[in-house]
């Protein structure tokens, strides 16, 4: 969940979304539609779409749902017009939050997000209030067993990635958002399957959290935001010691 703890966040989100397949499919449908609208319906020429189609396959999303989402994006089928919006706010303990939303109703989305922030001890902030604490970049999390560090660095950096970070869990590849499609395509051609591939907000400064009650409040705010239908992703800059959280 913590903004800095990338792999734990992926693991936690997988556990949450596995229990809410309907919302997973809804989110994927929106993302696929937007990707097809922006870059066309051919995944061979649209790396963002290809990445999402792989996500849909891994989530066992029905092929008919995927096909409809693509055709809505290309205009072959009528559909609701969605808009991508980013909201910023502060949670308990001064933790910064960025919430990515895909919605057909900006007013509803803003009201729901504001309500959740207030309910869990935070507040919605103005644009730019917290985003300076994050790096807006492409991010790929790749299990270490799939490839060696040297081989990954060669593939990723040749494709335009800015950095490859190694940890016990695996590798994190970062790139400029404009290089995301090219890097995604290069990793795919190498046969790599990232645990996560997304345009993310990566914290450049973090807020250490050692108090169990504060950690729970931050976690609950994160989860409550994630539960909202219009919310696609939630990023935060907390640095929670996971040993203080209750066992899940």
Swiss-Prot record:
Cited HAMAP family: Transcrip_reg_TACO1
Q: Which UniProt keywords apply?
A: Cytoplasm, DNA-binding, Transcription, Transcription regulation
GO biological process annotation, one example: regulation of DNA-templated transcription
Q: Does the keyword Membrane apply?
A: no
Mind telling me which SUPFAM superfamilies this protein's record contains? YebC-like
The primary location reported for this protein is cytoplasm
Q: Which InterPro entries does the record match to this protein?
A: Integrase-like_N, TACO1_YebC-like_2nd/3rd_dom, TACO1_YebC_N, Transcrip_reg_TACO1-like, Transcrip_reg_TACO1-like_dom3, YebC-like
Look up the coiled coil feature and give its residue ranges. Answer: none
Cellular location of this protein?
Answer: Cytoplasm
Protein's name according to its UniProt entry: Probable transcriptional regulatory protein Oter_1471
Lineage top rank: taxon: Bacteria
Molecular functions per Gene Ontology: DNA binding
- The signal peptide here is none
Question: Gene3D superfamilies annotated for this entry?
Answer: 1.10.10.200, 3.30.70.980
Keyword Glycosyltransferase applies: no
* Family affiliation: Belongs to the TACO1 family.
Can you name the source organism? Opitutus terrae (strain DSM 11246 / JCM 15787 / PB90-1)
A Gene Ontology cellular component where this protein is annotated is: cytosol
């Amino acid at each position: 969940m913590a903004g800095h703890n990338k792999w734990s966040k992926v693991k936690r989100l997988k556990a949450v979304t596995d229990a809410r397949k309907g919302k997973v499919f809804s989110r994927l449908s929106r993302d696929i539609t937007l990707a097809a609208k922006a870059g066309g319906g051919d995944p061979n020429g649209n790396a963002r779409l290809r990445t999402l189609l792989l996500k849909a396959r891994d989530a066992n999303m029905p092929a008919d749902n995927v096909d409809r989402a693509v055709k809505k994006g290309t205009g072959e089928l009528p559909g609701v017009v969605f808009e991508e919006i980013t909201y910023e706010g502060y949670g308990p303990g001064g933790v910064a939050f960025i919430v990515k939303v895909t919605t057909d109703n900006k007013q509803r989305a803003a009201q729901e997000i504001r309500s959740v922030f207030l309910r869990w001890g935070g507040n919605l902030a103005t644009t730019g209030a917290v985003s300076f604490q994050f790096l807006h970049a492409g991010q790929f999390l790749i299990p270490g067993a799939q490839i060696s560090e040297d081989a990954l660095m060669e593939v990723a950096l040749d494709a335009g990635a800015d950095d490859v970070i190694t940890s016990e869990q695996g590798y994190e590849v970062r790139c400029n958002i404009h290089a995301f499609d090219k890097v995604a395509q290069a990793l795919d051609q190498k046969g790599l399957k990232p645990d996560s591939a997304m345009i993310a907000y990566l914290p450049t400064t973090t807020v250490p959290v050692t108090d169990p009650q504060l950690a729970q409040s931050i976690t609950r705010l994160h989860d409550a935001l994630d539960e909202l239908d219009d919310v696609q992703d939630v990023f935060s800059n907390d640095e929670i010691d996971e040993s203080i959280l209750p066992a899940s």
